[in-house]
Design a protein with these regions (language model features):
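Phosphate-group recognition and catalysis centered on beta-loop-alpha active-site segments
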Residues: 22-295
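Intrinsically disordered, low-complexity, mixed-charge
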Residues: 13-16
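Bacterial N-terminal signal peptides that target proteins for export
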Residues: 2-10
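N-terminal signal peptide c-region/cleavage motif recognized by signal peptidases
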Residues: 18-20
Length: 295
């Protein structure tokens, strides 16, 4: 009896180890083209991230004054460059001459100033990296959704890039305006609401007829404020939305779910994402995470 139990315990341990050892390794996605290693959203950053074995590149796009999709994130050029004002105030050819590495610092130094790192267009990037998959975050603070969708479709068609791009935005209007041919994530609001219902009410709200491929993206952990309304007022409390096994099971209750976790900062984060079975992780430094991927 004792011998049998000992063998059973050994088998259980081996089984657990096997599951952990063969967990799917998430796709390493370079956030803002690898903002932790180089000036964000530049061709230089893309090249470095690919050298550091990133599986895909996440870039941020806005529309220039002449309606050309360009790679830039903040609402003011002063945040990252040697110029100021919104991206939409300048033509793409002007933006290409601005110093996109001006504000990037390393140990109180600015190693990328005056190195010729301009703001590239989406078309230039897709053409230069024909074998790379790009996740494209739409960040224009003032673009017309319909016009932006038209310009994006034009670029993707010219570069034959419909199958190697997928779009994301915190503004659902930008996603809704995209034509059917353009791949996209589910809306952030929808994803957050589903996760909140799982975390707080243990309620799984996957529609019964959901059986198509779909992509979800959200922070692995996110602080939120819960507002409860009553007849005589309301109550506010802090909470944390967290991806766990219950959440993963719910989101994958129907086939076709692909889950990308944001805000992965440490090796522990990466291990947790891997154990959860995440399909992708958004990281600032592919250089750092390439070492974790092989562990």
């Amino acid at each position: 009896m004792e011998k049998t139990m000992r063998h059973g315990i050994t088998a259980t341990i081996l089984l657990c180890c096997s599951v952990s050892a063969f967990a799917t390794t998430p796709q390493i996605i370079a956030h803002r083209a690898g903002t932790g290693d180089a000036p964000e959203n530049t061709e230089y950053a893309i090249s470095k991230s690919l050298e550091n074995k990133a599986d895909a590149i996440w870039i941020t796009v806005q529309l220039s004054k002449d309606g050309i999709p360009v790679l830039y994130r903040p609402s003011d050029l002063n945040s990252l460059t040697n110029k100021s004002g919104p991206v939409s105030a300048y033509k793409a050819k002007q933006l290409a001459k601005f110093d996109a590495g001006y504000k990037f610092s390393s140990d109180s130094d600015h190693p990328f100033r005056n190195k010729g790192l301009g703001i590239p267009t989406l078309e230039q990037v897709l053409k230069k990296y024909p074998d790379t998959f790009f996740y494209i975050d739409l960040k224009s603070p003032d673009a017309d959704p319909a016009q932006q969708a038209k310009e994006l479709e034009k670029v993707l068609a010219k570069q034959k890039a419909f199958t190697r791009t997928r779009f994301y935005s915190t503004d659902e209007a930008y996603l809704n305006a995209l034509p059917k041919e353009i791949q996209r994530f589910e809306s952030r609001d929808k994803t957050r609401t589903m996760l909140a219902n799982i975390t707080m009410a243990h309620q799984c709200d996957i529609p019964a007829n959901t059986d198509t491929a779909r992509w979800y993206g959200l922070e692995m952990r996110r602080n939120v404020e819960v507002v409860e309304k009553y007849t005589l007022g309301e109550a506010r409390s802090k909470s944390v939305l967290t991806w766990d096994n219950e959440a993963m099971k719910c989101f994958r209750a129907k086939s076709g779910a692909n889950i990308t976790l944001f805000g992965i900062k440490t090796e522990e984060d990466f291990k947790q994402a891997k154990e959860l079975g995440a399909d992708g992780v958004l990281v600032d430094s592919p250089k750092l995470f390439s070492t974790f991927k092989t562990n």
